[in-house]
Amino acid sequence: KVIDNIEEENVRDWIIYYTRGIVFDQEKRWAEAEMDFKKALEIRPEQPMVLNYLAYSWVDRGLNYVEAKKMLIRAVELRPNDGYIVDSLGWALYKMGDYEEAVPVLERAAQLETQDWAINDHLGDAYWTVGRKNEARFQWRHALSLSRDEDKIDLIKSKIKDGYTKPEI
């Protein structure tokens, strides 16, 4: 409520909208979250965390792939050693069907963030899709060792056992 009452000319800090956008997203209120992320980008168009969050959210929902890819490329340019941002770009490439291009990007993300289960899982999916089955299972086993979420653990175990069917584009 406080944020809604701030007058436009007094808003100088993008982080207010970014933070509220995350809260809205976690509450499954995507339309409101998206508006706040866009407002944060109006205030700070080159903010890599906002570029990443909004673009990854679009990709995750199957929306705005072309714009999301541009935003993620820019975010990686701004923060090339942020494994989470690099992963977002790699995952966007993967979701867009650019599997061969996605692999080295996801490999870089996994090098930067060795202990993140989701990044290792993404790399496993990409490896599987390009025919690198043994490497995929290795990445999934690593992801399994890092995950604490029972639903994710079951999904990863299934991939290790049965492989992975790439999603329709």
Model-derived features with residue positions:
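Canonical tetratricopeptide repeat
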Residues: 19, 53, 88, 122, ...
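Position-specific recognition of the canonical hydrophobic site in helix A of tetratricopeptide repeat
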Residues: 25, 59-60, 94, 128
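Residue-level detector of the short coil/turn that links helix A to helix B
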Residues: 28, 62-63, 97, 131
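Structural marker of alpha-solenoid helical repeat scaffolds
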Residues: 5-9, 43, 78, 112, ...
